[in-house]
Every structure is written in structure tokens, then in C-alpha cells.
Amino acid sequence: MGYAKERGKLEKISTKVSALTNYDDKSLAIITDIYEQYSHTVRILKNKNPEAFEGVYLNELPEVKLAKNALKVSEEAERQDNFIKFRDALSASLNSVITLSKEAQ
């Protein structure tokens, strides 16, 4: 079962995530869109191969979502720190899924 299409999407959005450094409205919109693409792709991969991707779906996806929610509810002074935590959690999970998709081939 090939995962090249999904891996290509994840690699593309992974480079976008690493370029985000500061919290502002534009970066927030970009990272929110990236999160939506990431979560959609993880669900597709889990449905294609539950054995390989269920761990990501059950563990890493909720972890990234918690970081996203922490950013959403944080006070103005904490937003930059929570943005960086969200970005790092998303980036780490993206890299994990990319590696898994290569191994699951």
C-alpha cells in the first residue's frame, strides 16, 4: 500500500511549520490550516493501515490538539510561548508520521 501522496502532503506542510517563528494573526491562520491538513491526513493513514498509524491517531494527534487548545485559551502574554509549543508538537508529530509512512511501505 503506497503512502507517497500523503507523505508528500506532510513533507510540504512540515516545511511550512518550521518557517513559523512568531505569533501573529497570519501565523495563527497558517498553523491552524496546517493542523487541519495534518489531522485529516492522519485520519486517512489510520483508515488505510490501522496497525501502523493507530498510535499516532490515539496519542500524537490528541497531544497536538491539546497544544492547539492551550494556545487558543491562553492569555496575551503567554501566546508566543504556547504558539512555539504548538508549533514544536505539530512539527514533531509530522516528522513521526512521515517516518512511519516510509517504514509502513
Language model segments and positions:
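Short terminal alpha-helical segments
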Residues: 1-35, 94
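Helix-centric, low-specificity signal for extended rod-like, repetitive segments
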Residues: 2-5, 9, 14, 61, ...
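Short, charged, amphipathic alpha-helical segments
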Residues: 8, 28-39, 58-59, 84-88
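Charged, low-complexity interaction regions
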Residues: 19-31, 50-53, 73-83
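Long, hydrophobic, amphipathic alpha-helical segments used as structural scaffolds
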Residues: 21-25, 49-56, 94, 98-105
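Short, solvent-exposed, charged loop/turn and helix-capping segments
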Residues: 40-60
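Amphipathic alpha-helical binding modules
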Residues: 65-105
